[in-house]
UniProtKB/Swiss-Prot annotation:
Protein name as annotated: Na(+)-translocating NADH-quinone reductase subunit B
Biological process per Gene Ontology, one example term: transmembrane transport
HAMAP family linked to this entry: NqrB (MF_00426)
UniProt family annotation: Belongs to the NqrB/RnfD family.
Lipid bilayer topology: Multi-pass membrane protein
Self-association state and partner proteins as the record states: Composed of six subunits; NqrA, NqrB, NqrC, NqrD, NqrE and NqrF.
Sites of FMN phosphoryl threonine modification: 248
Length: 503
């Protein structure tokens, strides 16, 4: 039956009046069956894995992130829009898989979570394929060439890097820009120098920044989520710094001013977690001893919230830590991110029980996809490894430099440099970009040595933007796009090295 439909489509397109539709018939035939065409120029390689199957393997590798996107976006939306502080409290204090699924089944419902997630993700996926496919077809008809299979992957990647609240017309505009400007302008699939999905996201980020950052990470209606959070905070009598919010770890890291130092974070952590020792313990205890002269019997781990705020914001000459009162909220939030408190626990970050772009929240889902891509040889392990190691190294290097520059074990160094190095792999889109974006064989270098340079360059830029640039909370997107631009240069350097070795 399918074969008859394809045959009838070919007959229809072979009529003189509709010959311009031949690329459409060829695309449908290639999608349903084995491609009809063979290479017209060398190299000629006989292999069962053609471009279509290669693309489908990438789509299969993306399935774990797609499932997490549906599940997590649905769960976060239902919890955040519940207006019930008890549900939110229970959700934030989940520990372990047993309590997690017990909470979902009792408080929310598995079917409800999946239905809510599908309502958020599937329309964006449909828009991505429909609009992107239309652009591909139009260019194929105009240029009279075959429709390539590249959109199979681009159409899946694009919605996974969007916030769930993105308006549909913006999503359509972004994928159109990515396909037309990022790919077709350079000649189509295999000719583009920029990743089309990231190009579309970059266009939206710089054109509509308010819709791509801020409070855009939960549900599909930001206004409803804000009202629900305000009601929950009111009912739970929570203040600004300990209230429920949809801030991501990267947002907190980026928005924290340099005036928030390591000693401020350690003081707050000592009080919340009842820690007996923190990295800046010597400075902290010295200041506290002076401040506590007016409050005999107090210890830093037994302060009330008001006393803690008073200690942290009092002038250093009086034994306080000298933080501006207006920055106490930021310091309190950053403490959660650095010490893994509440929703920013290592387990939540690794498995994806956090808010963020649809497909970028779960590191474990990205690693499952990486396993398939590496097993099939589609992705370069050199790019992945150099990207990951470079990110870890430069995050560690910034930390060491800040300690050496500030002295006193880094007690007075900016606190944002002290987020645990490994956490950079779990937050934002680093894991997703490392696995699925940086390894794009079209926009990444072709030589082995160049792949090492390329991955290291992207890792360095990612951490540099995250920790130094105050304008952008996430550096992965810009780092990979810049890496795409410099990829030919890395290949040129690598080839030059090869020639020198042979001589």
């Amino acid at each position: 039956m399918l074969e008859k439909f394809v045959d009838s489509l070919w007959k229809f397109c072979r009529k003189s009046k509709f010959q311009y539709m031949t690329p459409v018939a060829d695309a449908v035939d290639s999608f349903c069956f084995e491609p009809l065409h063979t290479p017209s120029s060398p190299p000629f390689v006989r292999d069962a894995v053609d471009v279509k199957r290669w693309m489908m393997l990438v789509v299969i590798a993306l399935m774990p992130t797609v499932f997490v996107a549906i599940w997590n976006s649905g769960l976060q939306a239902l919890v955040y829009q519940s207006s019930d502080p008890q549900i939110m409290e229970a959700f934030l204090h989940i520990s372990g898989f047993t309590s997690y699924f017990s909470f979902v089944s009792k408080e929310i419902g598995i079917a409800s979570v999946l239905f809510a997630g599908c309502k958020i993700f599937l329309p964006l996926l449909f828009i991505s394929y429909a609009v992107g496919g239309t652009c591909e077809v139009l260019f194929a008809i105009i240029r009279k060439h075959k429709i390539a299979e590249g959109l199979l992957v681009t159409g899946m990647l694009y919605p996974l890097i969007l916030p769930p609240t993105i308006p549909y017309w913006m999503a359509a505009l972004g994928i159109a820009f990515g396909v037309v400007i990022g790919k077709e302008l350079f000649g189509g699939t295999g000719m583009n120098i920029l990743n089309p999905a990231l190009t579309g996201r970059a266009f939206l980020f710089f054109t509509f920044p308010a819709k791509m950052s801020g409070d855009v990470w939960v549900g599909s209606n930001p206004s409803k989520i804000k009202e629900s959070l305000a009601m929950m905070n009111s009912l739970a009598e929570r203040s600004n710094f300990d209230g429920f919010s949809q801030s991501t770890c990267l947002q907190i890291l980026n928005s924290t001013p340099p005036s928030v130092k390591r000693v401020h974070i350690d003081a707050i952590a000592s009080n919340i977690l009842k820690l007996e020792h923190v990295p800046s313990q010597e400075v902290l205890q010295s200041q506290f001893s002076t401040w506590a002269e007016s409050f005999p019997g107090l210890t830093v781990d037994q302060l009330s919230l008001d006393q803690l705020q008073n200690f942290v914001t009092s002038p250093t000459a009086e034994g306080g830590l000298g933080l501006l009162p207006a920055h106490f909220d930021a310091a309190y939030s950053l403490t959660d991110a650095i010490y893994g408190i509440g929703k920013f626990s290592t387990g939540n970050l690794f498995f994806g029980n956090i808010v963020g772009s649809l497909g970028e929240t779960s590191t474990v889902a990205c690693l499952l996809g990486a396993g398939l891509l590496l097993l099939t040889g589609i992705a370069s392990w050199r790019t992945m490894l150099s990207f990951g190691l470079s990110s870890l190294f430069f995050a560690w290097l910034f930390k060491i430099i800040s300690i050496l520059a500030a002295g006193q074990s880094g007690a007075w160094a900016p606190a944002k440099f002290f987020i645990p190095v490994y956490r950079h792999l779990f937050i934002g889109g680093l894991a997703f970009g490392l696995v699925f974006m940086a390894t794009d064989p079209v926009t990444s270098p072709a030589t082995k040595l160049a792949k090492w340079f390329y991955g290291a360059f992207i890792g360095f830029l990612t951490i540099l933007i995250r920790l130094i640039n105050p304008a952008y909370p996430e550096g992965v997107m810009l780092a990979i796009l810049l890496g795409n631009v410099f990829a030919p240069s890395f290949d040129r350097i690598a080839l030059k090295q090869y020639r020198q070795r042979r001589v």
